[in-house]
Amino acid sequence: MSKTYIGIDIAKNTFDACFIAHNTWQNCTFTNNQQGFMELTLWIQAHHYNTSTLHLIIEATGTYWEKLAHWAISHHHKVSIVNPLYIHAYAKSLGIRTKTDKQDAILLARYGAKENPPLWQPKSDNEIKLTALLKQREHHKRQLIKERTRQEALSIYVKSYTDDNIRHWSDSITQLDHQIWQLINCTPELNHRASLLATIPGIGKKTLPHLLVAIGDGSSFQSAKHLASYAGLAPRHHQSGISIHKQSSIGFSGQKELRSALFMPAVIVSFGRYPAFQKFVKRMEQKGKTKKQIIIAIMRKLLTISYAVIRQNRPFDKRIHE
């Protein structure tokens, strides 16, 4: 039985849906709320499609997609959440320059039919809670940095007035760290994954929770390369003939917090502190890579190894991951 792919381009208040089946397509716009979800159901039923053949391809726009995705799962629909960068690249490969909500929905459906992306599984309640705690910690960390920077610019006569704010944000970060690790230690699946990640040289207590949130059980990513792309760590090459040969870069897309969490471990690894990665660092140096390129390559390597140990359910092995 062939699948029917429904592409969904979502915004804060509305979403456009388009299905492609038997070389024909139909599209419609709905409100991004429970009423709109029910109207989507009626629209699907009006076209006599079996729930078991439906596959919803939803673009990951902010957090606007989450309610619809959870609703779809509760109604036994297959769901894939797709990185907008993939759709942009797919449109570029087809030579499509027009960008409208309806056009994006059509593209998502076509992308689903061509790539059959992995199915999305909702996070457990504790994974959702861990994500929320980490976001709150990041907010408090930004506020702490802001206050410290502000204090440096203040006159010596008024610096003491910011001390209370700095103390407040520092204490709240300490409390959040305690809650984060209490949650990890008390949740069997999180604790197990954490124990696997902890075997990777360079991965410490500050980085580990970010990896748990980003990777989950690993099923949301087709490969380690897809995870690296999601994190914004996939290399971009710019080379043509013999005249154009620019330095590779990673751009500025993807998960900024995850990259930030991986940065310091990568810096430490780059100085040869961990024997397990010394050969890798030397190979990069012999290729003439800059220090920045080496650090980015190590960040990517730490991330892909993290994915591997979780997917394979095996601790770090120097012989495999060297």
Curated annotation (Swiss-Prot):
GO terms for biological process: DNA transposition. InterPro entries: Transp_IS110-like_N (IPR002525), Transpos_IS110 (IPR047650), Transposase_20 (IPR003346). It holds the Pfam family DEDD_Tnp_IS110. It comes from the Bacteria. Keywords: DNA invertase, DNA recombination, DNA-binding, Fimbrium biogenesis. The keyword DNA-binding applies. GO terms for molecular function: DNA binding; DNA strand exchange activity; transposase activity. The keyword Acyltransferase does not apply. May be the site-specific invertase required for pilin gene inversion. Moraxella can express either a Q or I pilin; the inversion of 2 kb of DNA determines which pilin is expressed. This is Pilin gene-inverting protein. The gene is piv.
